Design a protein with these regions (language model features):
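Short, solvent-exposed mixed-charge patches
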Residues: 117-119
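A short local loop/turn or secondary-structure capping micro-motif enriched for an aromatic residue
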Residues: 45-48, 83-84, 109-113
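Beta-propeller fold detector
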Residues: 37-44, 101-109
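Surface-exposed acidic loop/strand-edge motifs in secreted or periplasmic proteins
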Residues: 1-62
Length: 119
């Protein structure tokens, strides 16, 4: 997994007028010298899962290995507003034959409700 600022992508401008360079992330998986996956992701790779209004002001923050399951290798990705806590968590599953499936993860607040922590 290699993340890099990608100046060929549109610049993201936040509400304060600050400009941010978006990232592209390359995922390469090999097994025994055989290439299974070689794909570059941008935030647009996830456009079918993320609201277009959010996507317009967000950047692709990261992609990290999560775990290996019988379904494949799981990666966690996030698209976020730059320099903020607002993000959309995503899950990528790479099957043994290199097929990639993507899904939006639920935020903990959505799973447990906003008043899950009470004193």
């Amino acid at each position: 997994v290699v993340r890099r600022p990608d100046e060929s992508l549109p610049v993201v401008t936040n509400e304060q007028g600050e400009r941010f360079i978006d990232n592209s992330i390359a995922l390469r998986i090999t097994c025994g010298g055989k290439q299974i996956v070689d794909k570059v992701f941008t935030k647009e790779s996830f456009a079918s899962l993320v609201d277009a209004r959010f996507l317009k002001y967000a950047i692709l923050e990261g992609l990290v290995y999560d775990k290996t399951t019988p379904q494949g290798i799981i990666y966690a990705a996030s698209i976020c507003y730059p320099q903020s806590d607002l993000y959309v968590p995503l899950r990528l599953t790479v099957s043994a034959d290199g097929k990639i499936s993507m899904a939006k993860e639920e935020l903990l607040e959505e799973v447990y409700g906003e008043d899950a922590v009470s004193n």
